[in-house]
């Protein structure tokens, strides 16, 4: 096992010692966005950026001190592969007390664009809090509730740049039909039923829709990994309201503030570094 090559990350476990001090894995869908996130954190913290790990064609991975920045692609199968290989790597490195953060974008359920949603639980398309996988012909259900300690800490972070809420997240298997879009190649949805279903989601306490949280929380719950999903609303699905503002920085700011607080406690960053980092990110708002 010590000479095993992680197939999709293209990292050999003999090099796992490089990852022993990791405290956070910050993951998002887009490779370019995560690369830029890593570069900005490195510049503002004055911590050298590792060379890009040669992860092949599927993932990019950067290390800045105790943080890994990596893209997870689109959808549950892609993030699930990353979660498996990342966790194998960190466990082999004997990393301790690490946290996984997923940052990204979502659609709002009567929630306006620019609002940052911290997912308290991921809900499947049957409106149940389970991630279901088929192993040997048997459906295995894994709970998808968030780590309440992490969620409460994120909710309580002082922030004047944007609105932050916590609530249930609907996780779907695709972007078009399961998310009730009528502009896909296949569209057999009764338009009259869309608003009725959106109202059902709202009444169930669901505040946003995305495509990864179910697998993410199901995996992290199974292995007792501290975790949180932080997504910014790009469109309010109730009225399809959106604007041209680039909100990508919003979940990054919340993640940065949380990580800085924790790394200050770990004595892995000092107060000056934390201030520089937060100032660097918030000046873009």
Feature-to-residue mapping (PLM):
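Metabolite-binding pocket within alpha/beta catalytic cores that recognizes anionic/polar moieties
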Residues: 1-156
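Glycine-rich beta-alpha junction loops
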Residues: 30, 107, 170-176, 215, ...
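Flexible, glycine/charged-enriched surface loops at secondary-structure junctions
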Residues: 46-52, 97, 161-168, 265-279
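Short acidic/glycine-rich loop or secondary-structure boundary segments that cap or lie
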Residues: 109-111, 125-127, 174-181, 238
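Active-site rim beta-loop-alpha module in soluble metabolic enzymes
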Residues: 143-205
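Zn-dependent metallopeptidase/amidohydrolase metal-coordination segment
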Residues: 214-248
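His/Asp/Glu-rich mid-to-C-terminal helical/loop segments that flank catalytic regions of hydrolases
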Residues: 236-285
């Amino acid at each position: 096992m010590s000479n095993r090559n992680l197939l999709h990350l293209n990292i050999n476990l003999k090099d796992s010692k490089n990852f022993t001090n990791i405290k956070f894995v910050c993951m998002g869908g887009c490779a370019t966005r995560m690369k830029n996130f890593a570069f900005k954190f490195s510049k503002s913290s004055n911590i050298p950026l590792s060379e890009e790990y040669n992860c092949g064609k599927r993932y990019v991975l950067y290390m800045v001190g105790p943080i890994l920045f990596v893209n997870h692609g689109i959808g549950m199968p892609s993030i699930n592969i990353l979660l498996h290989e990342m966790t194998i790597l960190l466990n082999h490195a004997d990393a301790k007390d690490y946290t996984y953060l997923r940052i990204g974008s979502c659609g709002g359920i009567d929630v306006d664009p620019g609002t940052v949603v911290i997912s308290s639980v991921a809900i499947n398309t049957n409106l149940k809090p389970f991630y279901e996988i088929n192993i040997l012909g048997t459906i295995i259900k894994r709970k998808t509730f968030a780590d309440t300690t992490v969620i409460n800490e994120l909710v309580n972070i002082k922030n004047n740049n944007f609105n932050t809420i916590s609530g249930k997240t609907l996780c779907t298997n695709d972007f078009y039909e399961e998310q009730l879009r009528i502009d896909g190649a296949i569209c057999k949805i009764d338009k009259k039923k869309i608003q009725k279903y959106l109202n059902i989601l709202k009444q169930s306490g669901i505040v946003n829709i995305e495509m990864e949280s179910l697998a993410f929380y199901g995996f992290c719950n199974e292995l007792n990994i501290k975790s949180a999903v932080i997504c910014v609303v790009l469109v309010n699905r109730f009225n399809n309201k959106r604007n041209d503002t680039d909100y990508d920085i919003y979940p990054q700011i919340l993640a940065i503030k949380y990580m800085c607080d924790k790394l200050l406690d770990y004595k892995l960053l000092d107060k000056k570094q934390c201030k520089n980092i937060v100032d660097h990110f918030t000046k873009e708002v």
